Amino acid sequence: MELVIYIGGAVIFFALVMASIGLHEVGHLVPAKIFGVKVTQYFVGFGRTLWSRRIGETQYGVKLLPLGGYVRLVGMFPPAPGSDGRVRRYSTGPFRAMADSARAAEWENIEPGDDGRLFYQKKSWQKLIIMAGGPIMNIVLAAVILLGVTGIYGVLRAQPVVSRVQECMIPATAPDTTSCAGRPATPAKLAGMRAGDRIIAFNGVTISSWDQMSTAIRTNLDHRAQLTVLRDGHRVELPPVNTVVTGVPDKWDPGKRVAAGFLGLEPLVARERGGPVVVAKDMWHMTEQTAYALVRFPAKVYRTAANLITGKPRDQYGPMSIVGASRAAGEVAATDRIDVGAKIAALFTLLGSVNLFVALFNFVPLLPLDGGHIAGALYEAV
């Protein structure tokens, strides 16, 4: 039964991702038609056609391999300068040959009556809207999905409230991680922190969230820490202690360990609901993380490929494909550690984050990504 749930969760999530990709292409299709660009095809998937139907001049359909989608806008590439619109018979150099090949493919779809309806003939601002329409659609989808999850079910967030105080300093490599015999107490234990304490100030700075508290601890290294907590409704100044330096996962690259301050407490995790402002903050945080991941993406892909060749274990923080995300969704669906509501919320949160990633990835200013065409339109406008 667990296997059936796993497969079902993975398939449903994969279908939702493909629907998102289909809507991404709608984001290109609609403004293209509004601006009069000739659109010959709208397909979800690649390879052999499973189903199609022609409406007007556009053929809509589904293909065998559900690994993406496309909209064919006629005239994406302008003719070579000084030509009559057709391609040269001979090309010199590999890059010119590639460009001429692309122009040749475009010419096959151009008919005598298409003048004025070709993509390259449109104004720069129209090209910009058409090409940005896809990524913007994914951003809208991400916002709607995350707003639904946050507003209806809520999101689990760490609070600036102590859930558990760690008794002693136990190295991660220690053979016995349960005994405190002969080991020093943690700074939190020395300060007299208790479960249920709400942290309201750290070194005189008001604390309003766990993220703020976590950053304060990490950057404090081995310096003095003065904690103020709210205990049983009373404000309590705890004895000052020094945080200690230890190796913790890097905020931006969890696979890397960095030196940071350590206090020795675990925060309370509670489900919180929120509105558009909360979702906007979450999406901005996701955007920062995604942008950092995109910068490191080429190196991560190289390392993953090298590990496949050499047989080394795959980095758990390495690149994840749509199939990999679907597997993760299947694991969430099959687990018995959370209830059904939490599973649905987790799946849609993952779907929202995938949509945001697709949007940001497509904004990368390189062809054949949407960002490459957007960069070209901006260059023309300037």
Please place each PLM-identified region on the residue numbering.
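Small-residue-rich helix-interface/hinge motifs
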Residues: 4-110, 114, 360-381
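Residue-level signature of transmembrane alpha-helical entry/exit and packing/kink sites
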Residues: 5, 9-13, 122-130, 346-350
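Internal alpha-helical transmembrane segments
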Residues: 23, 34, 58, 69, ...
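Terminal peptide-recognition signature
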Residues: 24, 62, 134, 188, ...
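Functional transmembrane alpha-helices
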Residues: 114-122, 169, 250-358, 378-382
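Short extracytoplasmic/periplasmic juxtamembrane "stem" segments immediately C-terminal to an N-terminal membrane anchor
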Residues: 160-187, 194
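Conserved PDZ fold ligand-binding element
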Residues: 183-210
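PDZ-domain C-terminal substructure recognizer with occasional recognition of PDZ-binding tails
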Residues: 194, 200, 214-259
